[in-house]
Amino acid sequence: MKSRLLWWYQKLRVIKYRLLSDCERVYGKPVLRQPVHFVGQGEIRFNGKVNLGVYPSPFFFNGYIYIEARTPDAVIEFGDGVFVNNSCFLISDGPGISIGKGSMLGVNCEIIDSDFHDTNPQRRLNGVPRSGKVVIGENVLIGSNVKILKGVRIGKDSIIANGTVVTKSVPENMLAFGNPAKCGPRFSPQDWKQRVPAAEPQP
């Protein structure tokens, strides 16, 4: 009985945020396990099976995912097999955000492609902020509370540790950590083979 009530509670929350959403260019059919607020004049595209929200995980019942393609030319794109954990938010002010297939975002991640305000105090409200497309490669593991800022490119198979603030690009097969992010060590295909136990022979 309790599990059924919780299912309906979350289902109603998902419907509520869908009704609040104003983005008319959402393509694909993601799996909505948590409420998602789709905002903006741009395009939000889901390729294949994309999972939004994770249970059990923090903020599942009291948070929501925020995805905003703010300007008409903004595009936020998710590859097949991407998992986005609870209370993440992504905002594109034009250049765009791309997340490669098989990548995973931890709880409360932030990805933005713009400063949104000019750094000059005289032009803070009407200046042209710096911006740059964010590209996350395939099979990237991004921990919780990570911030990825404008112009960053993260190579495939890399790992971004919890709480990292990524201000510069990260090569593939790399561990990044800290604020601002530092890189090292680099992984190799041989490292992954050593971490995967060999299958036991069948009798």
Task: List PLM regions with ranges.
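A short, glycine- and basic residue-enriched loop/turn
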Residues: 133-134, 151-152, 173
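Short acidic, glycine/proline-rich loop/turn micro-motifs
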Residues: 62-63, 121-125
